[in-house]
UniProtKB/Swiss-Prot annotation:
Its EC number is 4.3.2.1. It comes from Rhizobium meliloti (strain 1021). It holds the Pfam family Lyase_1. GO terms for biological process: arginine biosynthetic process via ornithine; L-arginine biosynthetic process. This is Argininosuccinate lyase 1. Its main location: cytoplasm. The lineage of its organism: Bacteria, Pseudomonadati, Pseudomonadota, Alphaproteobacteria, Hyphomicrobiales. It is an enzyme of class 4 (lyase). Pathway: Amino-acid biosynthesis; L-arginine biosynthesis; L-arginine from L-ornithine and carbamoyl phosphate: step 3/3. Belongs to the lyase 1 family. Argininosuccinate lyase subfamily.
Amino acid sequence: MADGSSETKSSNQMWGGRFASGPDAIMEEINASIGFDKKLYAQDIRGSIAHATMLAHQGIISAEDKDKIVHGLDTILSEIDSGAFEFSRRLEDIHMNIEARLAALIGPAAGRLHTARSRNDQVALDFRLWVKEELQKTEKALTGLIAAFLDRAEEHAETVMPGFTHLQTAQPVTFGHHCMAYVEMFGRDRARVRHAIEHMDESPIGAAALAGTGFPIDRHMTAKALGFREPTRNSIDTVSDRDFALEFLSIAAIAATHLSRLAEEIVIWSTPQFGFIRLSDAFSTGSSIMPQKKNPDAAELVRAKTGRVNGSLVALLTVMKGLPLAYSKDMQEDKEQVFDAAESLELAIAAMTGMIRDVTIRADRMKAAAGSGYSTATDLADWLVREAGLPFRDAHHVTGRVVALAEQKGCDLADLPLAELQAINSAITDKVYGVLTVEASVASRTSFGGTAPSEVRKQIAWWRARN
């Protein structure tokens, strides 16, 4: 055998009965998942306790063996929590590491734990429990982010700023209204989280390898003990399924995309050229060479982490796309994608919540910019429709000529003399000046969901009652 490739003296004791020799060292390395799936230890122990309790209740194992198993598992949980537990790559994964330690602690009774169970349904359970718990954390984190935006929206319901399309000044809006747009976005993310929790609320344990088991188990009992609504209905689908992980990654990718869009605006708005916001020192960094710099690194890192989260979704979709039904070892590659995406999303939400709570809003700069770029041109067109009876397309054309005149003269629309306005369209009167201020513009947008402060406060109240 070539250098760097050797066999272990014996095969894995948990499955090696039909093997004459152990795996090659490279096989052992590629096969092992303990380096990352040890993160599932609490879920694995919780599932094993529920399984052992059910086996005893059904008379499949003795109450005495069940008590030994539960006591041993509690001991192992304490060992792992304290850092005293030694994980072994030779034992491949978290399931067999725990089972081997259990055998060392309680002897032959440990061998009864795996009755009516396979690692296929065991890992499906552990992973599903972990994802469910992570979704619950994400729901709580999103609720905190929404609350931060609601507070800023309430504070700035009347703060006027430019609204943009194509990153060009479009119409005046309020900063409170802009904040509420993010409330809606992150509210949808939270709704997706809640739906996913409900959608995946089925227990896989008891499906065994793929065909179920001939032992008289009670899957409803274990489902209830583990906090699931009910057991899964098809044993083949149960061990084939990673939809719950894909749903989590999809939710994470959409939420991360929303966070990235927010991060982009924070980066832009904090530049001297915009100057709409001032980031706190707590969420900024400096430069090693330029002493004047205050960099929005937290926002930039949130923006960058979106690529990692999106990549995790694509990676797992690609893993799953060619698999026949039931378990394939490919599915071992599911966890690192989810673990990494969950960590990235959790950190990104926390960072963004902190930035939103701490950021200083420069209302004077926002208001000054709100009137730039002829942002009240639509108000002029609307006035021509209401007061002069013009069809909107004609009003649009007239307003375009007015904007061209203002550009030529280098002034705002409100600074054009009435005579020059009337030279373009004789129906224009001095009352038009009343709609050309940014304050009048936002106050007039009273349609449901509009930017008028009165509407923004209604939006805030609606969300306060639901957050």
